[in-house]
Swiss-Prot record:
<dbReference type="GO" id="GO:0005506">
    <property type="term" value="F:iron ion binding"/>
</dbReference>
<feature type="domain" description="4Fe-4S ferredoxin-type 2">
    <location>
        <begin position="95"/>
        <end position="124"/>
    </location>
</feature>
<keyword id="KW-0479">Metal-binding</keyword>
<dbReference type="InterPro" id="IPR004497">
    <property type="entry name" value="NDHI"/>
</dbReference>
<dbReference type="InterPro" id="IPR017900">
    <property type="entry name" value="4Fe4S_Fe_S_CS"/>
</dbReference>
<feature type="binding site">
    <location>
        <position position="104"/>
    </location>
    <ligand>
        <name>[4Fe-4S] cluster 2</name>
    </ligand>
</feature>
<keyword id="KW-0472">Membrane</keyword>
<feature type="binding site">
    <location>
        <position position="67"/>
    </location>
    <ligand>
        <name>[4Fe-4S] cluster 1</name>
    </ligand>
</feature>
<keyword id="KW-0793">Thylakoid</keyword>
<protein>
    <recommendedName>
        <fullName>NAD(P)H-quinone oxidoreductase subunit I</fullName>
        <ecNumber>7.1.1.-</ecNumber>
    </recommendedName>
</protein>
<keyword id="KW-1278">Translocase</keyword>
<dbReference type="GO" id="GO:0048038">
    <property type="term" value="F:quinone binding"/>
</dbReference>
<dbReference type="GO" id="GO:0051539">
    <property type="term" value="F:4 iron, 4 sulfur cluster binding"/>
</dbReference>
<dbReference type="Pfam" id="PF12838">
    <property type="entry name" value="Fer4_7"/>
</dbReference>
<comment type="similarity">
    <text>Belongs to the complex I 23 kDa subunit family.</text>
</comment>
<keyword id="KW-0618">Plastoquinone</keyword>
<feature type="binding site">
    <location>
        <position position="110"/>
    </location>
    <ligand>
        <name>[4Fe-4S] cluster 2</name>
    </ligand>
</feature>
Length: 210
């Protein structure tokens, strides 16, 4: 008698727990059903990268002086600089320059320390290939002009959540030309003015609001 009642109690407890777990799962599902869609239909829709996005490295062959600073500051000594010494001019002659993006960690050290600014970071991130050797870009591939999400006619640009205008939560309903929430880095710099104090180096202070 008591064993039967214990089984009924255990069954009832398990049924209540199952119903509670099911209700919690449906609560999460219904909560998401009320939200607006945020899924990006890639590759027809792409998010606009941030201003400081570190994508594929762009290289300008004419500016390079083969100083190999990029090789020394690279954590993995990745860039390959092939040069020969011109005995007539006693200067280096650059023959080839390559970077393997299959190994690159996109830290940006080479771009930051380049004395001639021949390297720059772009917003390209589509570097997938069937052969890993295809990721080894020479100076010709590195010199290709970068593409932009906002200028590609076959792509609908979408802003990330942090770059949406104030009050907007859905990137699908916001056009690319609407002002974002907050100021761009260039706009922030415009609000700074150099001021020299006696005995101190010049520093930037915020302009007084008009």
């Amino acid at each position: 008698m008591f064993g039967f009642l214990k089984q009924v109690g255990d069954y009832t407890r398990d049924a209540v727990d199952a119903a509670r777990n099911l209700a919690q799962g449906f609560a999460v599902t219904f909560d998401h059903m009320q939200r607006r869609p945020v899924t990006v239909q890639y590759p027809y829709e792409k998010l606009i990268p941030s201003e400081r996005y570190r994508g594929r490295i762009h290289y300008e062959f004419d500016k390079c002086i083969a100083c190999e600073v990029c090789v020394r500051v690279c954590p993995i000594n990745l860039p390959v600089v092939d040069w020969v010494m011109n005995k007539a001019t006693k200067k280096k002659e650059l023959r080839n320059y390559s970077i393997d993006f299959g190994v690159c960690i996109f830290c940006g050290n080479c771009v930051e320390y380049c004395p001639t600014n021949c390297l720059s970071m772009t917003e390209e991130y589509e570097l997938a290939a069937f052969d890993r050797h295809s990721l080894n870009y020479d100076n010709v591939a590195l010199g290709r002009l970068p593409t932009s999400v906002t200028t590609d006619p076959s792509v609908q640009p979408l802003r990330e959540l942090v770059y949406l205008p104030a009050g907007e939560m859905d990137p699908h309903t916001v056009s690319a030309d609407r002002p974002r929430a907050g100021k761009l880095p260039a706009e922030v710099l415009e609000t700074l003015a150099p001021v020299k104090d006696e005995g101190q180096s010049s520093k930037a202070v915020l302009k007084e609001d008009a």
